[in-house]
């Protein structure tokens, strides 16, 4: 097992994600209460070729990423009410923790392993960093989904840029563009 550029283990947890009702308000609380920042915001995300529970997905979200130490934090707000892994959690228990992000160099093998263990692939899509993500439904045994995040492509550049910005962040320029 190695490490990704921001210090977390590859094939380990690199991200904690939360669904929120109001992205800007949530960012404000993370900055004020937890001193996490800066935040990189993507106003509209659907993924490329998104599939939810075996069907094409029309779900759209806005999201923000920041770092607390070496851990990536993702905040997610729905842009619509389309069926999605986000809507599932909100309807089941409200806003709050949603998923663990786990890095993997071998995405297909990781998905297959989870499926062999009985966990369904609830959502999959290609992402702007050039990789793929897959949300495995681990909600029966963990407090949320497990998102498999494919390493490679522009992953290190994108996440590395966010991480480097968080080191000795002075509280200025708290909200920045994701792209």
Enumerate the predicted regions with their spans.
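Short acidic/glycine-enriched loop/turn segments that link adjacent beta-strands
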Residues: 12, 128-132
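Glyoxalase I/VOC metalloenzyme domain signal
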Residues: 1-14, 18-41, 53-120, 137-179
